[in-house]
Amino acid sequence: MKILIMRLELRAEWVNSLKEKRMIVLSLTKRLSNKFNVSVSEVNYQDVHEKIGIGIVSVGTTKEVLYSLKEKIIDFVEDNTDAELIKIEEEIIDY
């Protein structure tokens, strides 16, 4: 069993309030969870309205499957939000 752990950091300079940011984060996390069957949560910057930190976890049978999933998730985030993806951290763990 392999476990993919990702942390994405996004910058959304046009966001003016935490309420507006939370609407964006909620929409993005729900769409990621539904489309890719992954666990998603806002993990950083809850009190900073211009930055978004999202954690994503998935389990797979091979590293290749998880690397493919990672690329699809990154493409989806870049295509479905106006926020700039500024940092990607990822790790695949053998369990």
Predicted segments, located by residue:
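Short glycine-/aliphatic-rich beta-strand segments at the starts of folded cytosolic domains
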Residues: 4-13, 18
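C-terminal binding/interaction regions
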Residues: 21
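A short linear hydrophobic-aromatic micro-motif
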Residues: 38-43, 86-89
